[in-house]
Structures are given as structure tokens and as C-alpha cells.
Amino acid sequence: LPVLKSGLWEVVVQNQKEPAPPPVKVLQCVDKQTSTLMLISPFSGQEGCRAPKVRKAGGGYSVQMNCAVHGVKMVTQAQLKGDFSSRYTGSFETLIASTEIAQPPAQRFEGQWLGACKPGMKPGDLELPNRITINLKEKAVANAKHDHDHDHSAPGHKH
């Protein structure tokens, strides 16, 4: 994947369901080390995902993520385009291998570089619309540790 320009990015995610709910805006503090994590964050919020498969396609990038959450397989297909230094756009769709879970609608997203990260933000920080900040880099490390601490297929496994 391309490397996002370091600094503060505003990412707007729009659900493609009709009628469409209001878009969700998040702020991301990005550096070279967190670029990939932040770039795929709109469509990679699950545990149990393999490393994304990335290929160049149609003047941009095609990304596929395979995940398994509590035995349910999910495949997310995403497309990304842009210069990745001032702006990028993308879309994604997740297919869930279950008849008991509703298929989520397709989503579109757009990232725009705003400048330097806000004071107090560190690379990997994602500021949600409710002003809560989570650090995706720390979350990824914690999820990796969690995945190795116990067997997700064990009977009665819960989060």
C-alpha cells in the first residue's frame, strides 16, 4: 500500500444504504509506521483477520481482508485511489458467510490531509465523533497478544 503523508487526516465514512445515515467523520494522526494501519482502518475493525492481500488495480489499489470471528468467516473487498499525500478515496464491502447475520451495506470513504497532528495526539490515534480517542497501534498490539493468549475455538469462548 502507499504510505500516507504524516500528519492529521480527516476521514469521512458514508454508508451506502438507502436512506443513508449521516456520514461519520474521524481524525487520524498518521506517521510512516502507522500509515497502513490507518489507511485500512475504515474496513479492518475485526479481530481474527489475516494480513491484507494488496494488489495494484485500475489506477489504485485493491485490498482483500479475510477474517474469522467466532467461527464466522468474513471477506472484505476494498478499493483505494488518490495521491495519498493530500487526498484519497475508497469503498469497501464485507461479505459474511452466514445466513443468520445481515449483510452490511457497502461503504465509501474519503481521506483529506489537514496538516500537523493536534497537540496531544500521537501516531496511531483515531479521534471518534464523540471525541473519544483510541490508539489503533496499541489496539493492534493488544489484539495480537490476545489472539496468542488463548484458543478462540474453545467451547464457550466469549469476549
PLM feature spans:
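Mid-chain, structured segments of secreted extracytoplasmic proteins
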Residues: 35-79
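Hydrophobic/aromatic beta-strand elements that line small-molecule binding cavities or substrate pockets
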Residues: 26-28, 51-53, 75-82, 92-96, ...
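Short, cysteine-centered beta-strand-loop-beta hairpins and adjacent loop/turn segments enriched
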Residues: 16-20, 69-74, 96-103, 117
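Edge beta-strand at a domain terminus
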Residues: 99-143
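Histidine-centered metal-binding segments
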Residues: 143-159
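Short beta-strand segments that buttress and anchor functional surface loops
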Residues: 11-14, 62-69, 90-98
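N-terminal helix-cap/turn-to-beta initiation motif at the start of protein domains
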Residues: 1-7
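Short, solvent-exposed loop/hinge segments that bridge or flank secondary-structure elements
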Residues: 11-48, 131-136
